[in-house]
Amino acid sequence: MAHSWVEIDLAALRHNYSRAKERLAPGSRILGVVKSDAYGHGMIPVARELVACGASFLAVSKHWEAVDLRAAGIRLPILCLLGVEPSEMAEAIRNEIRPVIYRIDHARRLSDTARSLNATATVHVKLDTGMGRLGIPCRHLEAFLNELLTLPAIRLEGVLSHFASADEADKTSSTLQLTRFREAMALLSARGLSVLGHIANSAGLLDLPQAHFDLARPGIMLYGSPPSLELHKPADLRPVMTFKSKIIQLKDVQAGQPIGYGGTFVTAAPGRIATIPVGYDDGYPRLLSNRGRVLVRGMSAPVVGRVSMNMITADVTHIPSAREDDEVVLLGAQGTERVTAEEIAQLCGTISYEIYCSIGRNRFKSFHNGIANSN
């Protein structure tokens, strides 16, 4: 039996997909984002579920993720958001992976590689409409197209960009990005090019229906978290991930007992301390030392002392029914209580995305359809 494990609720994933689909503007389709092991939720099982739900495309960040999806039998069009390196191009073409292109030298190499394979490489061009990160500046798009369209083994299927702050209440920046993206799409249309346009992430899908174009790219909302708490039109989402462990020891302690490294917590009165075999090695943030909480027998118990590499301690004095080997929920629901990724993220000064990715590295992961497996 594992000391800790992650449970993934595929029924919740399907529910969240349906909420995304309900928000789609007419004519738009879903491109499901499964990069970074589906935000820690398990890329291949999640991808299979999204295929069954009717997604039209999938997106990953890295080439090897796309190759793994193909090896798992996923035939849906797959977009590689970071593009592919020259050493990966032949494999990408053979696997019909769609690289995102933002460098003309890579486009040339890709075309040459495709010609050598007697094939065509299908690509999407990335525009920087204001995020300042990855992509061709809009003012350079026409010159980029002038060369790209001369490459004999390249098929331009799509153009994409990415919102920098669609998850904020103030949509000024997003509106400017949207204007620039529309202008780019108009330029393509004027040249007789019919391509797929996509810019909407989860926040764009929820709050900016005018940004849906041909595809929308939900990511975090598929996994049950809102992109932020500032959205004008939040959705009814269900968390997909639960993180569990168990009590491996219960200890009665006297007043004045230091707990954990450095004795940063000292008991003020006699009580009971539960030791739980989870630590920062398992993705449980050290920043939750003396700040976090876990669920035991449907009740909240504060984390006391420092989070160490493989263990934490919780004060269960107020839960007299607690027993050794009892299930502990570190993320998710137990009874009527719930610890959310947003709560953990706020305590750690980060975002839910990072919490999911960290916890999702746990090697013991099970998948269920609304009724969790026993461990």
UniProtKB/Swiss-Prot annotation:
The active site is at residues 35, 261. Keywords: Isomerase, Pyridoxal phosphate. Substrate binds at residues 133, 309. This is Alanine racemase. GO terms for molecular function: alanine racemase activity; pyridoxal phosphate binding. Its cofactor is pyridoxal 5'-phosphate. One of its GO terms (biological process) is D-alanine biosynthetic process. SMART domains: Ala_racemase_C. Catalyzes the interconversion of L-alanine and D-alanine. May also act on other amino acids. It comes from the Bacteria. Belongs to the alanine racemase family. SUPFAM superfamilies: Alanine racemase C-terminal domain-like, PLP-binding barrel. Pfam families: Ala_racemase_C, Ala_racemase_N. Its EC number is 5.1.1.1. The modification N6-(pyridoxal phosphate)lysine is found at residue 35. It comes from Syntrophobacter fumaroxidans (strain DSM 10017 / MPOB). Pathway: Amino-acid biosynthesis; D-alanine biosynthesis; D-alanine from L-alanine: step 1/1. GO terms for cellular component: cytosol. The keyword Isomerase applies. It catalyses: L-alanine = D-alanine.
